[in-house]
Amino acid sequence: MKVIKFNGLVFDYSRTFLSKSNLQTLTKLARQRDLIGRRKDMFTGEKINKTSNWAVLHTALRAKRSEKIYVDGKDVVAGVYEVLGRMEDFSDRVRSGKYCGYSGKPITDVVHIGIGGSYLGPRMVTRALAAHHHPRLTAHFVSDDIQETLKRLSPETTLFVVVSKTFTTPETLGQAEIAYNWFKAKGGKSAKHFIGVTVNIAGAVKWGIPEENTFKFWDWVGGRYSTWSAVGITTMMLVGAENFYKFLDGGRKIDAHFRKAPLTKNIPVMMALIGMAHRNFFKYPAYASIPYPPQLEFFPLWLQQLDMESNGKSVELNGKKVKGSTGPIVFGLLGYDAQHSFFQWLHQGTDIVPIEFVTTMDNRNCIFQANILHAGEKNAAEPQNNLPGGRPSTLLMVKEVTPETLGMLMALYEHKIFVQGVLWGINSFDQCGVEMGKLIAKKLAKK
């Protein structure tokens, strides 16, 4: 049976058309590409992002305190827990009402300003864990048009979280400037209403954020993997440190599974191999991410960036043009909304697109959709009502969406995408297309 279970999570790939021969070919490729060695390199801090000569250690953000992981001779886990401790202290003070605005009133609104991974991940996680939010606090995530958000807020009780890895991102700093000017114009009197999350602490301080209100992360944390770091401080303020640690624990459990399970019993590896078969053997150009729990409203957008920015590459690590296809198009929507928008195309369109369902185990509607997409519903008498079937799908099932299961789901996809990058021979941890676009935009702005 094509089902793998781990820690209450079920991965069902019985509705795919992955043959034994396909699987053997891909597992052979995994060994040829030294997946086991590359996996070890990532977890132990080797500088596998060759473009920037950086380690790739988002996994260290959720490591146990007792672990030792070294980059350039320095134990990074100790630094992670130092920042986590500061985050916890700050979050506890905001939640308890001890951290007040300039007029002495407790904080009621947290405005998180960021873009890309500094926005999509934290927004998704904070929305997914809404059941755990502090009743006094409301989070507002902004990447553009902060003016609309500011109309609803009071400067006395608003805290701004400015997130930029370099603290030079023009879109983010532009929105932060608007927020600062609004704050001052409304009578705001204290810089304590602003905190900064960045690699560039000096840049945040120069911008005007008090140093005690800055929270560090590191160059070995990619933006699209940064929610586990201080970038997640808005989430921690809303859900509390205890739930944030449970979220980290979920990711850590998948890390252990990914490192230890045999390839064909390894959920992220099998997710990757199935995705590669769909892309390279069956030539499917895309896949749809369809979560059914309403808490996962923003999951497809988070996944879209994670996958397409990581594996949307056409050059191998050796600088040569890739042979064949790499990362697919990723799109998606909540299950019931998707059923009443583009499921018509999925069921009866001329293109076949695999679906990756994420659901709770009690959702029969999702399983019914997967069955019909796979098996079809024949109706020769009325061709317009004929459902041809032959549409592959996978199911990731959890009992419920909790901080722990959310962490597990996210880590599964992170590792899936890493495996695919290894097998395609590309660097999943740079984004040269994005960076070149920024440089060109800056040049045009100067003209």
Where are these regions (language model features)?
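Extended, charge-enriched "interface" segments that sit outside catalytic cores
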Residues: 1-103, 366, 371-379, 386, ...
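Catalytic cores of large soluble enzymes that bind and process phosphate-bearing ligands
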Residues: 14-21, 31, 72-86, 117, ...
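Glycine- and acidic
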Residues: 67-79, 107-111, 135-141, 156-168, ...
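Glycine-rich phosphate-binding loops that contact phosphosugars or nucleotide phosphates
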Residues: 89-97, 103-261, 439
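Short glycine/proline-enriched loop/turn "hinge" motifs that connect secondary-structure elements
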Residues: 151-154, 349, 385-388
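Active-site phosphate/pyrophosphate-binding segments
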Residues: 182-366, 389, 436-442, 446-447
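Low-complexity, glycine/alanine/valine/leucine- and proline-rich hydrophobic stretches
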Residues: 374-377, 385-391, 398-404, 410-416
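C-terminal amphipathic alpha-helical interaction region
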Residues: 410, 423-447
